[in-house]
Amino acid sequence: MGWLICFCVFAAIIIVALYLRKIHGFLVDDRAPPNLPSLPIIGSLLSINSNSPPHIFFQQLQKKYGDIYSLDMGSNRVIIVNNHHHAKEVLLRKGKIFAGRPRTVTTDILTRDGKDIAFGDYSATWKFHRKIVHGALCMFGEGTASIEKIICREASSMCEILTNLQSSAADLAPELTRAVTNVVCTLCFSSSYKRGDPEFEAMLKYSQGIVDTVAKDSLVDIFPWLQLFPNEDLRILRRCVSIRDKLLQKKYEEHKADFSDNIQRDLFDALLRAKNSSENNNTSTQDVGLTDDHLLMTVGDIFGAGVETTTTVLKWSILYLIHHPQVQRKIQEELDAKIGRDRHPQVNDRGNLPYLEATIREVLRIRPVSPLLIPHVALSDANIGEYTVQKGTRVIVNLWSLHHDEKEWKNPELFNPERFLNEEGNSLCCPSLSYLPFGAGVRVCLGEALAKLELFLFLSWILQRFTLEVPGGQPLPELQGKFRVVLQPQKYKVIARLRTGWEKSLQSQESESG
């Protein structure tokens, strides 16, 4: 009988151990995605120690493990999705199931414990919050005269600066950042800044500090207990966030002090109006926990993400244009034929400038500003394709793999705007479903319409007047890029030459305005 008792005890231990492993997501299941080698505590960290940027490394692993596989970041199971079929299942068909967000130390600092849209977890509060933000953005969104006027003002200022800089090699990044920042600041709280403005310089400084620290992928987000020890990056992050929050609080208090339901100047006013309206209609914001913090973090989201991403796409666009002067000439020929020199490009011209639109789409494809989408979290047990996914599992869509899939894109490493045009070259088309530059579904980027509008107007204004070139005697800048918060191009300089005939055109415009 002794052996029977031992057998029963052993079997009981095995059953309990297997159960515990299952509920923590570590059970080896034939239906689970292939998993990278994993060790207790550290997970798969030793297996993902690579010199390649993560989006490239994950694409390389696709050859060994398939389109969908998993790895363990410490105790957290993470699934990597590398094709558009599974990506759209996660983002669209099962969007609400995978709408969660992971809590990390750095994002909690950035967002006051997830009180924003981008990193906030999926909940009744988040849905109500997103609804009022979406409504507010629609009032200033694509096609509205107010936002077009704001962008054109900054595009005009940018062109004036380029005119003064012509024939001189310059890094355009600071001026692009200022122009896009002014668009976002005007949209959010009716402020714009000139070069050297102290408040503007403070914004740039804290924004850069946030980007530099978040970009380091600190181990504290994998092992939160590490925050108990001195951490210089977290100290810098908290200081920069504190400076940001003081500025946002100042703007918010100013808006609350002179708020009027009859006047809507900007996004802050729109958010205040929506919040007040919901309270007056007995749609209690307390029921969903919506606070002033949520509105502040929303504006922080729009400012942080809106400036960094759009500026980066503009830098990539200019870089590819100087690499491909024939593309630049085709855009200019299109601008000359459809707009001429007697007026500036407008929103209504978008439909008449398919080659420019195709070029923007190709830039977003070949160098997606967020090659890895923000991680999603499964809110319940589910499936992705044939694989089982347990509740709490994190899912990352590798947008880089989608946009460089050789099964979907012919010569994906080749910059070719024509792939987004029909055979006649006069109309836009979608050559592949493997294209999601702004994400999709429940978590789609709220600023998509604004970003597209900025890209179109800034590039059309610049290329109507200027030809962008590499400084004489210098090699073409590299196209590799640096993976940080977004995929940034390396620093480079460019010469903006005023196009032939524009000197007289500008003089004529100045005399008419005078």
UniProtKB/Swiss-Prot annotation:
Q: Where in the cell is it found?
A: Membrane
Q: Which reaction does it catalyse?
A: a C21-steroid + reduced [NADPH--hemoprotein reductase] + O2 = a 17alpha-hydroxy-C21-steroid + oxidized [NADPH--hemoprotein reductase] + H2O + H(+); 17alpha-hydroxyprogesterone + reduced [NADPH--hemoprotein reductase] + O2 = androst-4-ene-3,17-dione + acetate + oxidized [NADPH--hemoprotein reductase] + H2O + 2 H(+); 17alpha-hydroxypregnenolone + reduced [NADPH--hemoprotein reductase] + O2 = 3beta-hydroxyandrost-5-en-17-one + acetate + oxidized [NADPH--hemoprotein reductase] + H2O + 2 H(+)
Binding annotation for heme: C445
Family annotation (InterPro entries): Cyt_P450 (IPR001128), Cyt_P450_CS (IPR017972), Cyt_P450_E_grp-I (IPR002401), Cyt_P450_sf (IPR036396)
Q: Does the keyword Heme apply?
A: yes
Q: Name one GO molecular function term.
A: steroid 17-alpha-monooxygenase activity
Q: What is its main location?
A: membrane
**In which pathway does this enzyme or protein participate?**
Lipid metabolism; steroid biosynthesis
Keywords in UniProt for this one?
Heme, Iron, Lipid metabolism, Lyase, Membrane, Metal-binding, Monooxygenase, Oxidoreductase, Steroidogenesis
What task does this protein carry out? Conversion of pregnenolone and progesterone to their 17-alpha-hydroxylated products and subsequently to dehydroepiandrosterone (DHEA) and androstenedione. Catalyzes both the 17-alpha-hydroxylation and the 17,20-lyase reaction.
The text of the family note is:
Belongs to the cytochrome P450 family.
Question: What protein name applies here?
Answer: Steroid 17-alpha-hydroxylase/17,20 lyase
